[in-house]
């Protein structure tokens, strides 16, 4: 239940000797009895106390007005802000006379820089300064003699100057003699310190002591405290004092250190961030400081030190009996037992009876009449008048709750009420509690009025009787449904109702969230399989449900679709060489998939009856291993040889890092590489030695290589082995642990603990907690790279232009003996242990990285949530597959130098030869390519004429294969004696080695062609060329050839010269034309010439990095400051040219803004012509469908809970189960007994099902024949979303916005899902636009609301300057078009 004491962390307990001690504790509920546990943080001891004792202490804490006592205990005029000294014997400074005289504090000598030997002798600075004053030391003196003790010999101490470094064995110190002017300035500043401290202390003390005002008895005491502070004249005097200090600093910057010292924010002692921020503001003389800043400091500082709290108002009672009764009432009202604990205590509880009564009345539509009748008794009009009267008096705090309670006392205390049934009493209570919430709304609105966020409180609108009736009806329905679903959840998940507790529900909640995404993963894979297979003899695109009722129906490989996943399907033995579907697919794969899906939906926890064999698992493992791209292939694809030609030493250094899998545990708590990447790129971009490259393509080549190397380096540094021989080495993980722990000693669990604390903090509403943790890790990592791998980011020696790069790439590729520069990657062993890992691995092979990453992250989140390693193996498999997919897409670069026409022809030939994607064995390669291999062997041994004569005729008889992979050289068995003699000069081992090498070369060539076949396709290439040609040729005369330099430079016309990967990788998408249609016109209209004119080249080479650096530095400078402070700073930047020039190192804001706008225009055009938005749109479609599919899975799960809950209450009867069906509710199929055959649950009879259907309808769930979820395939919202039609065929007949509305409407039965559909979908866009979260909380529909999308989304603002992101307005309009586009068609989906 958390810490009831708010900021209070200390609690009084008894030690073993029964002495009262104070310990730092956390309070939590203990479920094995009616007790709370105090977790003592220091040593994890526990002490149990009973409820009443704990609650009594809590109530005393809330009632006890000890604020003044706490304030005076922790603060006095000597420490409230500046750390000042008091006279001897004065512990607390409360008056001006208590301060030590300024002359005794600010001395004309300063001492610092003590040597280590002097520290060891224990001679203090004070002793040295006192002796120096006594001896009259001047700046000309070089030594001073001091006795440690009276009877000891004098020690001679050298007086160094500040430019001389101390040594290990010297006995020295720096003594600085302060000049008179500086000394007087410091004394005057010290007097100001005293004035500020005394004024602050007296203001706060006065407010706390004020009995009349009683600030801390107000609900919003912070606001009242702020008002009181700002009204006090002394706060203006304090501000004036601060300005005096600033003026003195401005005239002499050496004074800054003196002020900092007395502000005392350094050191190891506890300091608030609030104080540190105020100190920064005080010392930053270029920024305005206001009285509001001072008031905010006081409020937050008192809160930080646990001084302020709201004091409970307690009516004074003279009668002892009444006082005891009142205290008992308090105790009862504060005992907040866990709701699951309540459920156990009252399991035979009357709530079941109440809920059954509500269900019957909801079903009969009589509940609304009952609510309206009770509401009429509550006399709302009278209450409104009483409340308005009280508000006119200025009372808008807990007093209005008193009016409310008094108004309804007659209803709840009367004998008439006590005679009502439990069901009626509960209905009264629900209404009462709802109205109490409306009173709370009045209080919230009053605060908004006071803060000028609202004009006035509209009580009549808040307490409108007709609106109240509708809202209370929803509340009653929700109350009823919650209990039904609560019971159903326990029953469905087979949880023991007598022992259930919060830990059970925490585990269950984690599992539920994983299950929802797994069901969505099944749906996504079903879509991918529908791209490969189609129904036999049916000429439409009707969906096949491979993991449901369709899995054994007739379907065939779709010959119309050329899909790279066919190779995977064939290697899994799901189709044979004639492309017929095998039993392995129907009887095994889909059966296992169906079983696993049903296990999830039916919450089956018993051990799996495994259907798959180790041979099945090995097929998947072999596919993953065969798809792996070697380090050499990666090097070739990413041109590491060219980019890191002069950096072999740094690559060797990276390869020499020894890794340990023991560090794997820390990986999951660290930021992903994508989070670190922007800062890594900044290391490259901000390196002053690096000059701009000649073309965008050159920079892309360098950056792609740099990103890959850094990705591998990041993994290696995390996994670096902490061996004994590495003790002297600066290992990153050790550095990070020291940084997080802020000490030299290493806490081995610090990373895990830091991460989990950030997660806990985020769950409590601190949205920045995780980002703050990630930032700290990233800063440490970037610092580590700067110290140890700076050379990696220095490309000052890289002088090649794009032509030279391509020539070198060709030369290296043509050189067969060239030893490539590679980054050695660890070769993980893939293991599949059961059917679940088998099915998920295949799903991952069939899906894109965008989908795999979602389910991978959910497995990871569940692992952390439940603190389990159960899913670690599947996470490793998914990571491996994503890595393969990423690297495979990079293999396009080697084809840059091919003529497009030639390349298309080449692909046609490859398609003929490698239509089945079959990987051949060594024996098959030798037999199939015998002539090629033989010719290579003859060339190798050409000097031996006699031997070559035999090899040409008899090589196939000399090479003897034992099996498909092993062979031997036999020069005797199958050839004549004379031939044996001729072969005598050819070494047997050499011949075997050469044959094996040429088989491997041929194998590599075959794999390369197959890989090329998988990635490229002649049809795709032709379409690619067509789209590029359309852009170049379809131009008006004034725009003619504006795309020439981007796509086909004149001197290399018709070549795949500048490869647009974004276009190519999307062109094979069945929906390419639809997606491209959204942006094609914008690309045509783009001013592409701007990218290559003088202005554009200057922007690319200079302005982009300059603007990015300015924005980053500004963000770093203002990081951690309050919003108000940032606004003041930015306002001054925009209005004051001198201030802007001084802080930003640019002319003025207007010139900066002009440069920013030009850079933005350049980036926008660049993104268009590079086809970047194709990926974004495709990603949007996947993400939207994924989010909506999760909502549909949520609905399906809830239906299971509702059926089980109604059965648990005895409202409906069931007669058994259909184990092969997943859905919870029946579907009409024309048969009389559909309610027993079409759902997982068999309803007892038709009457029982009709009752269930009517109850569901009462809650807002329509299961009728023509309802949303029971419509035909192309109309049912359930099928449309679950079958991923938004991705498969977007915009057809429906807009996406309409489908979002339909899903939201379907889930409207539960107020828990209020607007959750909209909120989850719009989260997809949050990286690209700013979302109005207040608008998202309101009720709305997307269809029929013309301006709702404009209100929900605003262009993204970047940096603290609040500049509009370069493409945010364009993306916002693109999103609106994406959501609202509709293509009316008569075709079926």
UniProtKB/Swiss-Prot annotation:
Its EC number is 3.1.-.-. Part of a type VI-A uridine-preferring CRISPR-Cas system. Changing residue 471 to A: Severely impairs pre-crRNA processing. Belongs to the CRISPR-associated endoribonuclease Cas13a family. CrRNA binds at residues 219, 441, 489, 759, 865. Residues 499-636 are annotated as: HEPN-like fold 1-I. The keyword Magnesium applies. Changing residue 1312 to A: No cleavage of target RNA, no change in pre-crRNA processing. Residues 330-342, 405-408, 432-436, 471-475, 502-509, 853-858, 1311-1316, 1338-1339 are annotated as: Binds crRNA. Residues 900-1170 are annotated as: Linker. Changing residue 1283 to A: No longer protects against infection by MS2 phage, loss of ssRNase activity. It is an enzyme of class 3 (hydrolase). Residues 637-828 are annotated as: Helical-2. The active site is at residues 438, 441, 597, 602, 1278, 1283. It comes from Leptotrichia shahii (strain DSM 19757 / CCUG 47503 / CIP 107916 / JCM 16776 / LB37). GO terms for molecular function: endonuclease activity; RNA binding. Residues 348-498 are annotated as: Helical-1. This is CRISPR-associated endoribonuclease Cas13a. Residues 1-347 are annotated as: NTD. The keyword Magnesium applies. ssRNA target cleavage requires Mg(2+), weak target cleavage is seen with Mn(2+) and Ca(2+). InterPro entries: Cas13a_endoribonuclease (IPR053395). It comes from the Bacteria. CRISPR (clustered regularly interspaced short palindromic repeat), is an adaptive immune system that provides protection against mobile genetic elements (viruses, transposable elements and conjugative plasmids). CRISPR clusters contain sequences complementary to antecedent mobile elements (spacers) and target invading nucleic acids. Unlike many single-component effectors, this CRISPR-Cas system targets RNA. CRISPR clusters are transcribed from pre-CRISPR RNA (crRNA) and processed into crRNA (optimally 28 nucleotides in this system) by this protein. Its cofactor is Mg(2+). Can be reprogrammed to target specific mRNAs in an E.coli system, which might be useful to create specific RNA-targeting tools. Residues 893-920, 968-1046, 1101-1131 form a coiled coil.
